[in-house]
Amino acid sequence: MAEFEDTTVFNFGSQKPENVRSMLKLVYEALEEKGYNPINQIVGYLISGDPAYIPRLNDARNLIRRFERDEIVEELVKDYLSDHKTDQKK
């Protein structure tokens, strides 16, 4: 019975993004490291849903797929509009 008393820990990997912003930073860095244009590749993924736009390097493909594409777009729009709103107040 002693063999069933220990807890087995499942590890998803060292890089677990807490939010869309941190995930996008990690994906962006992986794309740059591979020599791709990060903006073009991320836009291609968001439009098509094809994970082939994102490399496997540093687990970037799995990281981006942890979020729904509409969640990513929502965060990008929120971030853009919050920056734009701040710019107008200046």
Curated annotation (Swiss-Prot):
Pfam families: IreB. InterPro entries: IreB (IPR009309). Transmembrane segments: none annotated. Belongs to the UPF0297 family. This is UPF0297 protein OEOE_1166. The lineage of its organism: Bacteria, Bacillati, Bacillota, Bacilli, Lactobacillales.
